[in-house]
Amino acid sequence: MNLPGLTGDRVLPPALRGPFNAESRRWLEALEVAGHDPIHNLRPCRVKPVACGRLAIVQESRRTGVGIPILGYLLQTPDELIVVDCGLSPRWRGGGQIHLGPDDSPSPGTPYMPELDGPSLAEQVAEMGLKPDRVICTHLHEDHSSGAVELGLPVEASGAEWARLDESDAESRGYPVDELAEVPRRTIELDPSAPLGPFLASARINTDVIAVDTAGHTPGSISLVASLGSAWVLICGDAVYPRMDDPDGPAWRGMLRISRALADLPALRVLPAHDTTVLRAVDGDAWMGAAAMPVDSDHD
């Protein structure tokens, strides 16, 4: 696959660059799963990470009343409908706030997520009458993977993420051990002999989608590069959000390397998982709550 602009050490900022065009709308829709009144909020990163550094995640007052979205994406290609990140399990509905980060060393910058308030991603997909073919998780933190049980499909993630899930402290690090014990595993095998532009390893998902190595936020984080007609997108999960418990370690350096690369690729639109600019840039208030744009009928 020839990806325009994916050469050398260049790429784009970790927030959506420009609005979706009509052709992109045919293929991609975002679902906001939750995001009401968290204790902490992520501030959308609208500048190059090399400039904003550790301010990619900041602590804000609860009094702001600004919710943080937890975004899952439905990626429709000619071959299949893929759920990319599946949000929170219904067990978080009315269950209080969750802490994503190590229980033994919470930091001021560690984000707190709200309880699930409203329909889960799977419930929204069912209401739209859609039947996904695959579920791919950029990483296995609970706000990206715990909703998988409802979808009734195997979960695909990198080998490094599955290995992290099996470690003794996985649950305290934000991995939904109990929920993921109920779903079949599929491993995406990243090939270091197949780098793609600034990404050190890749794996083909189908003719229109490639998984790339964006380890840093977690040891096995991946992102998906997708061809959407004339547009290219990178669904990056939390790859551009640093781990605050390891600010100077390899995780931070990996995140910073990817973010620097993403700062200069003008041909690529970057879709993070917790950035309100994605919602505003796509369709304003129409994207809030359970509202979602239907998949184009030509590609059902």
Specify the residue positions occupied by each region the protein language model found.
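Metallo-beta-lactamase
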Residues: 30, 34-38, 113-130, 159-213, ...
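Active-site metal-binding loops of divalent metal-dependent hydrolases
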Residues: 52, 86-89, 140, 160, ...
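Active-site metal-binding motif and surrounding structural segment of the metallo-beta-lactamase
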Residues: 97-156
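Histidine-centered catalytic micro-motifs
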Residues: 135-145, 213-221, 271-276
